[in-house]
Amino acid sequence: MNYIEARVYLDEVSKYGSVLGLESMRELLRRLGDPQNELKFIHISGTNGKGSVLAYLSTILTGAGYRTGRYISPTLFSYRERIQVDGEYIEKESLARHVTAIAAAAEEMQKAGLPSPTAFEMETALAFLYFKEKRCDIVTLEVGCGGLLDATNVITTTVMEVIASISMDHTDLLGDTLAKIAAQKAGIIKPDTLVVSARQQEEAMQVIEDTCKEKHCALQAVDESRISDVRCGAEGQTFSYKTWENVTISLAGSYQIKNAALALEGVEALRQLDYALSDQQVREGMAHTVWRGRFTTLRRDPTVIIDGSHNPAAARELKDSLERYFPGKTLYYVMGMFKDKDYAQVIDLTAPLARHIITVETPGNPRALPARELAEAVARVNPSVEWADSVAHGVERALAMAGKEDAVIVFGSLSFLGEAADAVNGK
């Protein structure tokens, strides 16, 4: 296969959906030589914030001289963005070569009467093959969904698990209580490892503590009472945490302070594991971390922000950030959601702040909530709403309505933010 053929192949496989479970993934990797067994991992789960924490840690590790793999999903701007080494996307040739091998292994499985691997399983196997080929010193690995039964959880060579903030999401797959969801997220914890956790609601924290005790793991949790001296701006922030004074981050959004504190806890854990991370390397890594799509400013006059707040917990943080960064400002929204999310609560939290809201539909995704249906839901909270027939049209409408002193907030499903950013930038 060439690159285009490999992408078409994976797109075709993705139409069959995804399932939770590890047997098919284990069999696929066995046929590929179990590349994951030759790597070391930082495994990251959670509902919100896991991608940001991964970005902080991988940037710090790369800056300290460790060849660092990064596996994330979904991505905003390029398919190849999901697999990186030291910030560089996987090469098209490498992707095509490894997908060719994966497709052959999948065909062998089908001939043997075994279930065919899902697209996410194939992509995860692709990442493992590539990271092995690149001889990565460490891989920062983001869970796709949940943790316990996620395809990434076939790994056995983790040096540390990180659990970001847990809240109610994917309840159809992970469970209808916070404890059940936390059990899935904590399912990545391996025996005798270091575990670092965000501050959690009591119900979730109890599950994590019990899991760590059962598996003889040391647990470090963020103490938010030790966060101080927070100074926010749309271009970045500074804060202090425990013995770390005046740490600068380039990521905006009030929630990024909490994510950065979790990353600093991760740094301390890595130091316990003899990773050589100097204070200067940590500070530079925190300051230089880029994580597009999380309260990211795309332009000024008017200010345009894109943010992947797609569930109630994230919407609550977005609301807090909007009130903090834009007090008294006129806000216009471009909003797109998946129908399997609790979009009604997202609307309740965010819609009252907006002068006008334009709803859009994420193109080419069967989970997308139709723009007209989303507009009808918004109208129950804020009657100043319309729906657009495309993401580009929605962005154009918002920019036409907003004055230079106003702000346009494009948020919701991560899957449409890349297209929205292209529309803002005139691509």
Which ranges hold each PLM region?
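C-terminal helical cap/extension that packs against the catalytic core
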Residues: Q201-Q220, E235, T303-I306, P312, ...
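Membrane-proximal helix-turn-helix segments that form the acceptor-binding/catalytic region
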Residues: A182-K190
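ATP-dependent carboxylate-amine ligase catalytic core
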Residues: E27-L29, D34-N37, G63-T156, D172
